[in-house]
Amino acid sequence: LKCNKLVPLAYKTCPAGKNLCYKMYMVANKKVPVKRGCIDVCPKKSLLVKYECCNTDRCN
């Protein structure tokens, strides 16, 4: 699985066990992602941050 990094056009290959890509946003500003990468379990959203997870190459 390949997941996008925060830097445009950059991505990384996920290590074994991390089979989801994620994008993290601040709830106050949903247009600008704060963090992107590989993860094993999609975190729950909170009052301040929202996560979007997916399982195809560079889907984040």
Swiss-Prot record:
InterPro entries named among the record's database cross-references: Cytotoxin_Cobra, Snake_3FTx, Snake_toxin-like_sf, Snake_toxin_con_site, Toxin_cobra-type
UniProtKB keywords: Cardiotoxin, Cytolysis, Disulfide bond, Membrane, Secreted, Target cell membrane, Target membrane, Toxin
Protein name from the UniProt record: Cytotoxin sagitoxin
MF annotations from Gene Ontology: toxin activity
PROSITE patterns: SNAKE_TOXIN
Tissues expressed in: Expressed by the venom gland.
Oligomer and partners: Monomer in solution; Homodimer and oligomer (homohexamer) in the presence of negatively charged lipids forming a pore with a size ranging between 20 and 30 Angstroms.
Superkingdom classification of source: Eukaryota
Keyword match Secreted: yes
Role according to the record: Shows cytolytic activity on many different cells by forming pore in lipid membranes. In vivo, increases heart rate or kill the animal by cardiac arrest. In addition, it binds to heparin with high affinity, interacts with Kv channel-interacting protein 1 (KCNIP1) in a calcium-independent manner, and binds to integrin alpha-V/beta-3 (ITGAV/ITGB3) with moderate affinity.
Subcellular location, principal: secreted
Subcellular location: Secreted; Target cell membrane
Family affiliation: Belongs to the three-finger toxin family. Short-chain subfamily. Type IA cytotoxin sub-subfamily.
Single Gene Ontology BP annotation: killing of cells of another organism
Disulfide bonds: C3-C21, C14-C38, C42-C53, C54-C59
Cited Gene3D superfamilies: CD59 (2.10.60.10)
Entry GO CC: extracellular region; membrane; other organism cell membrane
